[in-house]
């Protein structure tokens, strides 16, 4: 799908960006989130300079993204470790079953 121009409002300023039609809702949601963050920052920090507010918001969003990436990386590493442990457990159980079958002469097929 080709991107189409979309007009959005960010903190009272109009921006035209290209966006695929199927991602327009996500873009609007992101714009709403950014507007809310900027408004919250303006109230909390009493900073009135829009450029400063945008930079602070960008830093906050970047920090949050970095934290989420770290969580995802840690979760993936944890899952890989669990999978390795499960594989070892299964392999050991199969080896034990093979030894038991050899000793008793029974076949479980």
Curated annotation (Swiss-Prot):
Q: Report the record's Gene Ontology biological process terms.
A: division septum assembly; FtsZ-dependent cytokinesis; septin ring assembly
Broad class of the protein's primary localization: cytoplasm
Q: Which Pfam families match?
A: ZapA
Q: Which domain of life is it from?
A: Bacteria
Q: Where in the cell is it found?
A: Cytoplasm
- Output the Gene Ontology cellular-component terms: cell division site; cell septum; cytosol; plasma membrane
**Alphabetized UniProt keyword annotations:** Cell cycle, Cell division, Coiled coil, Cytoplasm, Septation
Q: Which SUPFAM superfamilies match?
A: Cell division protein ZapA-like
> Does the keyword Amino-acid biosynthesis belong to this entry?
no
Q: Which InterPro entries match?
A: Cell_div_ZapA-like, Cell_div_ZapA-like_sf, Cell_div_ZapA_eubact, Cell_div_ZapA_N
Record keyword Lyase present: no
**Coiled coil region boundaries:** 21-97
Subunit: Homodimer. Interacts with FtsZ.
Function summary: Activator of cell division through the inhibition of FtsZ GTPase activity, therefore promoting FtsZ assembly into bundles of protofilaments necessary for the formation of the division Z ring. It is recruited early at mid-cell but it is not essential for cell division.
Family from the record: Belongs to the ZapA family. Type 1 subfamily.
**Cross-referenced HAMAP family:** ZapA_type1 (MF_02012)
The protein's name:
Cell division protein ZapA
